A protein has these predicted regions:
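Conserved catalytic-core segment of clan PA serine endopeptidases
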Residues: 24-27, 75-116
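Protease-domain processing segments flanking chymotrypsin-fold serine proteases, especially trypsin-like
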Residues: 1-62, 70-82, 161-162, 173-174, ...
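Extracellular collagen-like Gly-X-Y triple-helix signature, i.e., selective recognition
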Residues: 195, 201-235
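Catalytic nucleophile loop of clan PA
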Residues: 54-55, 129, 181-204
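Chymotrypsin/trypsin-fold serine protease catalytic domain
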Residues: 92, 107, 112-113, 118-180, ...
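Active-site-proximal beta-strands of protease catalytic cores
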Residues: 60-65, 130-141, 194-208
Length: 235
């Protein structure tokens, strides 16, 4: 069976695989969009958030490939400044190596129809140090923006058997994060993992809540930085 893609479209499938859902994060710490101006949401025209994303320049959003696979992009818009501004999508693409079963290469780009004057964040090109602290910014069940503190776990360690995953599951385009708060759970796919003020990961999948020995699995952004750079130029 396919892994969990923390996505509301797949809640029925996800219930069979994991207890992470897109109902919203639990256990996060309240934050503000001014602290994370680069965080955006992919949402329906009714305002319902389906995925997170992050601005890497004034018109380009990085998000998870699953978000463009499981939703009709023509029916999505991008919420900027925590939804205060809604921008149409001009074009989009996802990594051609994205695999529905393994969740390998779970990364995509969205080009906005107009530039936005908010903060952006740099894409990390070097692997984060194992054990470094990071933060996931996402929304809780009440639609409040929250931070979830994470301890970053590298690819080889996460798949070593010390946690819930085998080396066959944690592939080279993935890294993991263990929630610092034992009660933290859930996040929208595509929500950014930031460490050292750079984008190092995107929420992708997991078998648990990212805690109690069950790390959340993220798209490993440094391993896909070249694809992001080249694709953003041609999008």
């Amino acid at each position: 069976m396919a892994k969990l893609y923390i996505s509301s479209v797949l809640l029925v499938i996800a219930a069979c695989v994991s207890n992470i859902t897109a109902d919203g994060a639990e256990g996060g710490v309240a934050t503000t969009i001014s602290a994370h101006p680069y965080v955006v949401s992919l949402q329906g025209t009714d305002g319902s958030k389906v995925c997170g994303g992050v601005l890497i320049d004034t018109k380009t959003v990085v998000t998870a490939a699953q978000c463009l696979n499981f939703y009709d992009v023509s029916q999505l818009v991008v919420g900027v400044s925590n939804g205060a501004k809604v921008v149409k999508i001009a074009s989009s693409t996802f990594n051609s190596g994205f695999d529905f079963t393994t969740m390998e290469n779970d990364v995509a780009l969205v080009k906005l129809a107009e530039a936005v004057s908010v903060g952006t964040i740099a894409v990390a090109s070097e692997q984060p140090t194992n054990g470094i602290s990071g933060v996931v910014t996402t929304w809780d069940a009440s639609n409040n923006l929250v931070d979830i503190a994470e301890t970053v776990i590298g690819t080889s360690e996460c798949g070593s058997g010390d946690y819930s995953y085998s080396e066959d599951e944690i592939l080279s385009t993935m890294l993991c994060g263990l929630a610092t708060n034992a009660n933290a759970c859930g996040a929208l796919p595509g929500s950014p993992l930031i460490a050292n003020k750079k984008l190092v990961g995107l929420v992708s999948w997991g078998y648990g809540c990212g805690n109690k020995g069950n790390p959340a699995v993220f798209t490993d952004i440094p391993s896909l930085a070249s694809w992001i750079s080249s694709s953003a130029k041609s999008l």
